[in-house]
């Protein structure tokens, strides 16, 4: 599938609908492939963050074990990495202090920098701060909110990460919104448009029946059967 078409199509749906579409593709429900805890968002927007993962790890609970010069070099290397050779990059950062995160990597400065670099958004299990000062149009979906950056520093780049129970590898297709995040294996990307369309169509008979004034259990049974018959 053409990447621009994939992004355009999946951006029209929320993350729960994407999870339902994966159930259709797999032919069964699943307990993997999505985050397992509540998240917070930088922007009061339902527009999802959609793209391909650029991954890193951070820590804030203790000072870095290398010199400030090396820390600065790693940070520049990180910015170079996230803009290199990937269409629609989404930054995915694991805070290895989790579940006791104390320092925010995400605030006014990094939001401005990432927005300026044309990154599509961020998913992290770590902290977010500077609420009310963040540039509009850049979404950070984070694990929690806190006041300080503490000793926050990058420790690894381009590595598998775990965000609230969701395993993400560099280059994975990711879809996230205020509900949380999920990934779609690349082998299933071509099947997504049909599966998403089917999710919506199968809900229509039930929703239409339920919203009628004379709705009752018999109408519900018929609506469910109509939904099950849609293939």
Predicted regions and their residues:
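Channel- or pocket-lining gating/hinge segments that regulate access to a cavity or pore
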Residues: 180-182
